[in-house]
Amino acid sequence: MRNITNFLKTFLLWELLKGLKVTGKHFFTRKVTVQYPDEKTPISNRFRGLHALRRYENGEERCIACKLCEVVCPALAITINSTEREDGTRRTSSYEIDLFKCIFCGYCEESCPVDSIVETNILEYHFEERGENIMTKAKLLAIGDKYEAQIAADRLQDKDFR
């Protein structure tokens, strides 16, 4: 009897039918795949994307060149050079972030005492030439100026968790 059962299981490809049963069960369920360029999933306001430097309302940059973000960066992706102004305050002469090194951990954003460096919701960007991965101070300020309203709204929503 056992030999007949084994023969029927082998002849009827029982294991294959069990696999097809699983496939058939999942074939008619709702799809979870998102066709990315055409459909986009919602992004949290806490998403850590492309960096930006912010300015005060009067147009002056917020960064005071304390270099805390440079020190706390685990990937050593941030490089800051500073100069002292005539009134005795320091400001950055160069601020660079190497996006190939950056791991988007958010430590730079958390450590900033004046809320100067932030990570935006921008997740789609590319580089066509060598060296474009280095975000300079001018690029970071331009991103901050362009998306300031969105950055401020996200910071306002997230204020209870800071």
Curated annotation (Swiss-Prot):
<keyword id="KW-0520">NAD</keyword>
<protein>
    <recommendedName>
        <fullName>NADH-quinone oxidoreductase subunit I</fullName>
        <ecNumber>7.1.1.-</ecNumber>
    </recommendedName>
</protein>
<feature type="binding site">
    <location>
        <position position="112"/>
    </location>
    <ligand>
        <name>[4Fe-4S] cluster 1</name>
    </ligand>
</feature>
<dbReference type="GO" id="GO:0009060">
    <property type="term" value="P:aerobic respiration"/>
</dbReference>
<dbReference type="InterPro" id="IPR010226">
    <property type="entry name" value="NADH_quinone_OxRdtase_chainI"/>
</dbReference>
<dbReference type="Pfam" id="PF12838">
    <property type="entry name" value="Fer4_7"/>
</dbReference>
<dbReference type="GO" id="GO:0048038">
    <property type="term" value="F:quinone binding"/>
</dbReference>
<comment type="subunit">
    <text>NDH-1 is composed of 14 different subunits. Subunits NuoA, H, J, K, L, M, N constitute the membrane sector of the complex.</text>
</comment>
<keyword id="KW-0479">Metal-binding</keyword>
<keyword id="KW-0874">Quinone</keyword>
<keyword id="KW-0677">Repeat</keyword>
<dbReference type="GO" id="GO:0005506">
    <property type="term" value="F:iron ion binding"/>
</dbReference>
<feature type="binding site">
    <location>
        <position position="73"/>
    </location>
    <ligand>
        <name>[4Fe-4S] cluster 2</name>
    </ligand>
</feature>
<feature type="binding site">
    <location>
        <position position="108"/>
    </location>
    <ligand>
        <name>[4Fe-4S] cluster 2</name>
    </ligand>
</feature>
<feature type="binding site">
    <location>
        <position position="69"/>
    </location>
    <ligand>
        <name>[4Fe-4S] cluster 1</name>
    </ligand>
</feature>
<keyword id="KW-0830">Ubiquinone</keyword>
<feature type="binding site">
    <location>
        <position position="102"/>
    </location>
    <ligand>
        <name>[4Fe-4S] cluster 2</name>
    </ligand>
</feature>
<keyword id="KW-0472">Membrane</keyword>
<keyword id="KW-1278">Translocase</keyword>
<feature type="binding site">
    <location>
        <position position="63"/>
    </location>
    <ligand>
        <name>[4Fe-4S] cluster 1</name>
    </ligand>
</feature>
<keyword id="KW-0004">4Fe-4S</keyword>
<feature type="domain" description="4Fe-4S ferredoxin-type 2">
    <location>
        <begin position="93"/>
        <end position="122"/>
    </location>
</feature>
<dbReference type="InterPro" id="IPR017896">
    <property type="entry name" value="4Fe4S_Fe-S-bd"/>
</dbReference>
<keyword id="KW-0408">Iron</keyword>
<keyword id="KW-0997">Cell inner membrane</keyword>
<feature type="domain" description="4Fe-4S ferredoxin-type 1">
    <location>
        <begin position="54"/>
        <end position="83"/>
    </location>
</feature>
<feature type="binding site">
    <location>
        <position position="66"/>
    </location>
    <ligand>
        <name>[4Fe-4S] cluster 1</name>
    </ligand>
</feature>
<feature type="binding site">
    <location>
        <position position="105"/>
    </location>
    <ligand>
        <name>[4Fe-4S] cluster 2</name>
    </ligand>
</feature>
<comment type="function">
    <text>NDH-1 shuttles electrons from NADH, via FMN and iron-sulfur (Fe-S) centers, to quinones in the respiratory chain. The immediate electron acceptor for the enzyme in this species is believed to be ubiquinone. Couples the redox reaction to proton translocation (for every two electrons transferred, four hydrogen ions are translocated across the cytoplasmic membrane), and thus conserves the redox energy in a proton gradient.</text>
</comment>
<dbReference type="GO" id="GO:0050136">
    <property type="term" value="F:NADH:ubiquinone reductase (non-electrogenic) activity"/>
</dbReference>
<dbReference type="InterPro" id="IPR017900">
    <property type="entry name" value="4Fe4S_Fe_S_CS"/>
</dbReference>
<dbReference type="GO" id="GO:0005886">
    <property type="term" value="C:plasma membrane"/>
</dbReference>
<dbReference type="GO" id="GO:0051539">
    <property type="term" value="F:4 iron, 4 sulfur cluster binding"/>
</dbReference>
<comment type="similarity">
    <text>Belongs to the complex I 23 kDa subunit family.</text>
</comment>
<keyword id="KW-1003">Cell membrane</keyword>
<keyword id="KW-0411">Iron-sulfur</keyword>
